[in-house]
Amino acid sequence: IVGGQEASPGSWPXQVGLFF
């Protein structure tokens, strides 16, 4: 699931990451 939150699980802080 594509997420646009910061410091989301499985993603880089401050950037748009993916929810895995």
Curated annotation (Swiss-Prot):
Give start and end of each Peptidase S1 domain.
Answer: 1-20
Query: Which UniProt keywords are listed?
Result: Collagen degradation, Hydrolase, Protease, Serine protease
Which GO biological process categories is it annotated with?
Answer: collagen catabolic process; proteolysis
Which GO terms label this protein's molecular function in UniProt? serine-type peptidase activity
Enumerate the catalysed reactions: Hydrolysis of proteins, with broad specificity for peptide bonds. Native collagen is cleaved about 75% of the length of the molecule from the N-terminus. Low activity on small molecule substrates of both trypsin and chymotrypsin
Tagged with keyword ATP-binding: no
Q: What is its EC number?
A: 3.4.21.32
Q: Which InterPro entries match?
A: Peptidase_S1_PA_chymotrypsin (IPR043504)
Q: What does this protein do?
A: This enzyme is a serine protease capable of degrading the native triple helix of collagen.
Q: Which family does it belong to?
A: Belongs to the peptidase S1 family.
Q: Mind telling me what this protein is named? A: Collagenolytic protease 28 kDa
The record lists the organism as: Paralithodes camtschaticus (Red king crab)
